[in-house]
Amino acid sequence: MFCIQCEQTIRTPAGNGCSYTQGMCGKSSDTSDLQDLLIYILQGVSSYAALAREVGIIDHEIDTFVPKAFFATLTNVNFDDERIIAYTTQAETFRNRLKAAYEAKCSELNIDAKPMNAPMQLVLGASKPEMLSQALQAVPNRGKDEVHEDIMGLRLLCLYGLKGAAAYMEHARVLDQTSDEVAGEFHEIMAFLGEDSVDADKLFNTAMQIGQLNYRVMAMLDEGETHAFGHPEPTQVNTKSVKGKAILVSGHDMKDLELILEQTQGKGINVYTHGEMLPALAYPELKKYPHLVGNYGSAWQNQQKEFATFPGAVVMTSNCIIDPNVGDYSNRIFTRSIVGWPGVTHIIGDDFSEVIAKAESLEGFIYDEIPHLITIGFARNALMAAAPTVIENVKSGAIKHFFLVGGCDGDKQERGYFTDIATQAPADSVILTLGCGKYKFNKLEFGDINGIPRLLDIGQCNDAYSAIQLAIALSEAFECDINELPLTLVLSWFEQKAIVVLLTLLSLGVKNIMTGPTAPAFLTPNLAKVLEEKFGLRNTTTVEADLNRVLNVA
């Protein structure tokens, strides 16, 4: 086992990365190794998909499958070995299908088929033990003794960034947003990563290419969500429980939430969002359901306590899932799509009757809590509508600075930094937030500036797209570069979606971003130095020092 993809990975003087019998996320060494093998075979599939495109062959079923299966290897997504093996054997079948189609087309065109890389050639073993032995050649730091650590760091930066982009591609696909061009570029990058390049410049440029690709994917996802559910509107949301039977929906998938709302109409079941599903309550086509009563709980890392005390059924539509046996709720949590946990019921198709039956069999909340309201829904359309007023307040001096404080949440004590920087930001500043990092402060009161709320909740992590659109609008209004705006980005990272959002911002030329609470363990000191020199990227330090620096306080 070797895994270094998330913030909680092991860091020791001897080296970084989880390499024992179990990762810090709870992933077993077998699961980790099987995921590595899956990625390796997927790189072979993408290699053939890229070659097939050169001779005019596009297989949309495979274009859909590869990002989805890749998504299953993100942090806290799928811990079910049998599901991972099934993805891997299906990937080999697809690879062989593309191989046959490509070679037949080359023969038809009387041209030579191009040479195969290693992931295109591996023949899977027939059993789990055989596959585990094959995983040794698929480990993400393969060749570490022969290549410089900076090359390995760049490979991992690209691999984990592309994982994040794959997740957003799958979220977009669920909402009928696909692109042959995006899929083609994705396959090209996957194929390149399967070649284990030692070209530092090419790897760095590929990381920027992944960021650019993800910008297009986030635009597709934005289009899919707004087309299906309308543009988010500023909306007050109750964060307390309501008497009645209950279903809790966590993850990121708005479509699954809509299906659950449709199927629970008139059944006396209240539906709650959790974690990154909170922004759903601002979409007109979702909040129209009266039994979507509010948001329960907070960010992913608190689920073992929050799900244990939730008296209803729970649905995980995407990341992040952690061991449901700890809170003894494994018999009432359900997984969807790419999510998996051994022994937990997995919902296939669009029928949530098992979830509904479980909710009906449970007690539910026995009384109404006193409501506590927070305001959400300041996504792209709402921000653009407010832009003229915001610009007036900037010109008048009422608003002097913007902070974007968001990203992933986690349980490290150092993450209190993000609460403190939001609460200690000057009263003449506006704080934008997104992702589950918002839970560090989104229930606090920040007041307003001439009617403009000082805290603007943009949405999910992918709604960084909305923040980018606001920054572009402001830079155009003030006729300046984005980096000349009174805007400070403070990003909390935990996993691969945050990595690709960071790559997106860097690829767009956004500079002077602060990230924390720690730097990714796969980034070597040399790579961190390059990113600081090129983009001004730096780690958070102390709230006082960082605020003084960005506000130019002596």
From Swiss-Prot:
GO terms for biological process: response to hydrogen peroxide. Its cofactor is [2Fe-2S] cluster; hybrid [4Fe-2O-2S] cluster. Hybrid [4Fe-2O-2S] cluster binds at residues 252, 276, 320, 408, 436, 461, 495, 497. It is an enzyme of class 1 (oxidoreductase). It holds the Pfam family Prismane. The keyword Metal-binding applies. GO terms for molecular function: 2 iron, 2 sulfur cluster binding; hydroxylamine reductase activity; metal ion binding; peroxidase activity. One of its GO terms (cellular component) is cytoplasm. Gene3D superfamilies: 1.20.1270.20, 3.40.50.2030. SUPFAM superfamilies: Prismane protein-like (SSF56821). It catalyses: A + NH4(+) + H2O = hydroxylamine + AH2 + H(+). Disulfide bonds: none annotated. [2Fe-2S] cluster binds at residues 3, 6, 18, 25. Keywords: 2Fe-2S, Cytoplasm, Iron, Iron-sulfur, Metal-binding, Oxidoreductase. Its EC number is 1.7.99.1. The modification Cysteine persulfide is found at residue 408. Binds 1 [2Fe-2S] cluster. It is found in: Cytoplasm. Catalyzes the reduction of hydroxylamine to form NH(3) and H(2)O. Belongs to the HCP family. HAMAP family: Hydroxylam_reduct. PANTHER family: HYDROXYLAMINE REDUCTASE. This is Hydroxylamine reductase. The gene is hcp.
